[in-house]
Amino acid sequence: SELALYNTVLSGMALDGKSFFYVNPLSVVPSACHADSRLQHVKTVRQKWFGCACCPPNIARIVSSIAAYAFTENEDTLLTHLYLGGSIRKTFPTGTLTLSIASDMPWDGHITVTLHADSPVSGTLGFRLPGWCPNPNVTADKPVRVADGYAYLSGEWHDGETIVLDFPMPVRLIRANNRVREDMRQVAVTRGPITFCAEQADNGENLHLLRVDVEDFGKDGEGVQVLPDSRFGHRTVKLLVPGFRQ
């Protein structure tokens, strides 16, 4: 769900929340969309609104209810699935515990969880270990038990205790399955939960002629420059990937 939320749901909406893609295919050729009447429903820039605007309100509803996807609970356990900055309060049989989460996901994998309680509270906290992270690390004063993709910490919690989660974000090159004819020789560049997009605005026309230089890319993406980008009033990250145009 994390990959879908970041790469499908959010990418359909502009950063300012005022324009949208109604359809959002993985690859768009502007000249083809403008020339072929069968493709004119595929817009090359986000649109302000639609005559039948069923999807934009659904995106807004998902974003506004994201906390329901981020956490689940039972009587003595609180599970964290999505690392959103903010706070969550959980009532255990022995008392109430508040988790304050400092997170800059999806751009930075360092997360600090600070616990607040009026008195000691016993219970279990579980944190999802993302599948995109090869070497996650959890630091706390409690033993860590890993099961089914989650790190579980159980015991008596005190006010001011912290749990630190580190999810390294190497840049990865993911190759498409050659059994899919249209995806032959295609790759995706990812970092953390984000799949990055090469756009004409940054790279010029004829994107199909771009090739990633696999040798310079490096085994673990060490040849890629990870640069902060705040051009649009929001902190994001852009990648400079070694490559060439055929």
Placement of each model-derived feature along the sequence:
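C-terminal beta-rich recognition modules with glycine/proline-rich loops and embedded aromatic residues
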Residues: 2-7, 12-116, 146, 158, ...
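Non-cytosolic beta-sheet module surface loops
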Residues: 103, 115-119, 128-131, 155
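Beta-strand residues in well-ordered beta-sheet regions across diverse protein folds
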Residues: 114, 128, 139, 154, ...
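Beta-strand-rich binding/interaction modules
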Residues: 120-140
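Solvent-exposed beta-strand/loop surfaces of large extracellular or lumenal domains
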Residues: 133-154, 172-179
